[in-house]
Amino acid sequence: MKQIPLFITVLALFAAPLSGAFIGADFGQAQAQKAKREKPKKPKTRRSEVLGKAAFQRIEQSQTWLGEEKYLEAFAPLQAILESERFSAYEKAVAIQTMGFIHAAQGDYAKTIASFERALATGHLPVRVVSDITYNLAQLYLAQGQGQKSLALLDQWFAALEGEPSAAPYALRAQIYLGMDNLAAAEKDIRLAIAKAEAPKQQWTRILLSVLLQQARYKEARPILEDAVERWPGVKTFWQQLTAVYYDADDEKLAFVAQQAMHIQGMLSSSKELSSMAQLYLYHDVPIKAAQVLQSGMDAGKIEKTEKNYELLAQSYRHAREWKASIAPLTQAAKKSDKGKFYEQLAQSHLQDEQWAKAEAALEKALEKGKLEKPADTWLLLGIARVRTEKYDAAIKAFRKAGDDDDTARDAFRWIRSIERRLAEERDAKSDG
């Protein structure tokens, strides 16, 4: 159940500015309260205009129903005040204002604005309440995307204010200026707000960073972002912005550290984010970590099982010299691809594990699929695999294919001569026997 403060009393009607929870803005009730002058002078209220007992009871009943979220019931006693001639203009103004708070609780900001403006138009509200409603209206119009109107109301609020404003109104005006692309004015106000605040606020830091980053003032943004990730380590946006700033300064190591921090905190969840993180681990010579990111991501269904991702996983295992582990992703990549390169890589993993027959089969499939960058190299490997399985005639055929290419001819014919010598020695041994 929502707890709505009784902002109407018999003694005075000094409503706090509408909370961010109501208007959908980033400036909540606590900020709005700080917007009031720190040492307010006595408001120029009309002492004769106070709520009578009947009006007070009806408004109090409306507040009770509002707290219970019984909105239709909450309107009834207020409407009764408006329709009766027994109530004063002041009491009717209070009823209209209260209707605005009910509309706000319902999320109907257009009607909230209409009620507040209608209440102001009566001319019967205390000066302090007029100030608060004006501030609320500035927030509401901003939430509705009407920056110009919001700015006009806030400037009106500043002009009527007695004393020194606190930080929040400057931050609100900075947000308005930012939405209007008036970056210079936004920066001036947000720096004033931050200077007045006891501690930096996340939303205000966001506004200042937006001003700086839009102007490519990355050097100025860097210390602010470094402070932000320490204060609010769970905010992904700050880490992303800091990473970009590090890259702009060609500080790849710190950018990598920032991205690791996001990964460790579980901020990377999409297939693209996780596969990119794996590529970074691979780039920074941590291949086994790259493989772990990809393998766990695929197993959990977070990383898409595409040809490209299987290739990256296999590459990570191969760089880590985990030949056996690379076989499964290479097999999957080979099935998905229309090129023979993955079967060739699969064969290389089998060769490292001395699985000659499996290597031979994979190389034959690689040549069958084709589209190889250097088929002569594949023929050479196939010849070697066949030698290891003592298929000498088939090996010679493969080496002759490899010999058609100048780059592999020397090695190919050296293998052929080696096979011929071995076969000759075997024949001699048999004849001697």
Describe each model-derived feature in a short phrase.
Residues 2, 20-117, 124, 129-132, ...:
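N-terminal leader/linker segments that initiate helical-solenoid repeat arrays
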Residues 44-50, 82-88, 120-126, 156-163, ...:
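Solenoid-like repeat scaffolds
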Residues 51-60, 89-96, 126-136, 162-172, ...:
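Generic helix N-cap/helix-start motif at coil->alpha-helix transitions
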Residues 63, 101, 139, 175, ...:
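Residue-level recognition of tetratricopeptide repeat
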Residues 307-321, 327-376:
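Alpha-helical adaptor scaffolds
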